[in-house]
From Swiss-Prot:
Keywords, ordered alphabetically: Ribonucleoprotein, Ribosomal protein, RNA-binding, rRNA-binding
PROSITE patterns documented for this protein: RIBOSOMAL_S19 (PS00323)
Record GO terms (molecular function): rRNA binding; structural constituent of ribosome
Function: Protein S19 forms a complex with S13 that binds strongly to the 16S ribosomal RNA.
Highest taxon of source: Bacteria
UniProt record, GO biological process: ribosomal small subunit assembly; translation
GO cellular component: a single term: small ribosomal subunit
Protein name in the entry: Small ribosomal subunit protein uS19
Organism of origin: Polynucleobacter necessarius subsp. necessarius (strain STIR1)
InterPro entries named among the record's database cross-references: Ribosomal_uS19, Ribosomal_uS19_bac-type, Ribosomal_uS19_CS, Ribosomal_uS19_SF
Family: Belongs to the universal ribosomal protein uS19 family.
Amino acid sequence: MTRSAKKGPFCDTSLVKKVEVAQANKDKKPIKTWSRRSTILPDFIGLTIAVHNGRQHVPVYVSENMVGHKLGEFALTRTFKGHAADKKVTKK
């Protein structure tokens, strides 16, 4: 079930404040956040946000296509190392 349209998108207030400060100062340093649940707003375009994935902060450069998605979608939490290779049995 999706979020109600009348409520609007959710974004952590602390993240919004950090974005406003970064835009006012024309700062290009990544903004560190643990808020994976925050929706990407149009104000975030052009900024780099370091999203926590449980171990480290993954830098995510926000583009126009990302608006409306959640920050957590772009910082993967699980590392896929591949499936085990098939062991071929040779007859003697």
